[in-house]
Amino acid sequence: MFKYKPKLLVIRIALRYKEGYLLPEDKYDANNHGRYNKYLRSKSKEVKEDLDSLIKLLKIIYKNDLVGYMWKLRYDCYKQFYYQLMIFLDGDKCSKDIAIAKDICGLWKDIVTQGNGECTNFNAYKKPHTNLGLGLRYADERELVIQDAKIFIEHDYFVSSMLSGKQQRTFSKSHIPGETRSGRPSKFQKIIDTHYL
């Protein structure tokens, strides 16, 4: 992406749900293994739809500034399904990474999940020796960005085994060249116009 923009604003957030929101009524045991896995597969589709909704909103709000993004679906017994999301904005036009990440977290919590979501803004917790690839980065700092992005290629065996053969991705990246496309307005445009802009 540095080929398109020599300066990028790199944002990383974790998108999840409030505790208990994705949990089934019955806890897992050996007798309900199949039913539990079916429930988890249906929930994985729901969280993917929410991620798609957020990305559509980002394409509207940052249509001239969004250079690309990548996401990774993860699962653990406490957070249930959640997404790691890394966003790349044009560094010549955007510089306030913490504020932008906070706004994106607000979109996730208030609009996409209608109050059922939670979000971690990693840009707000940058420390001197961690998350060095976040914030405003130049082309000669690409290795720092790569180090921060390595979490996206770590294999999650539980998620991939549960979704195998289901034609559902656990990782994806998108590259958005600087040109804007014309087309019919998104259903989210009205929401953005009335709530966020």
Model-derived features with residue positions:
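Catalytic "initiation/cleavage/transfer" segments centered on a nucleophilic residue
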Residues: 1-3, 29-32, 91-197
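Signature for HUH/AEP ssDNA processing cores
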Residues: 1-70, 74-75
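A structural signal for short, well-ordered beta-strand segments and their strand-loop junctions
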Residues: 12, 82, 117-121
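A generic structural motif
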Residues: 19-21, 90-93
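A short acidic (Asp/Glu
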Residues: 23-24, 80-84, 97-99
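Histidine-centered divalent-metal-coordination microenvironment in nucleic-acid enzymes
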Residues: 68-92
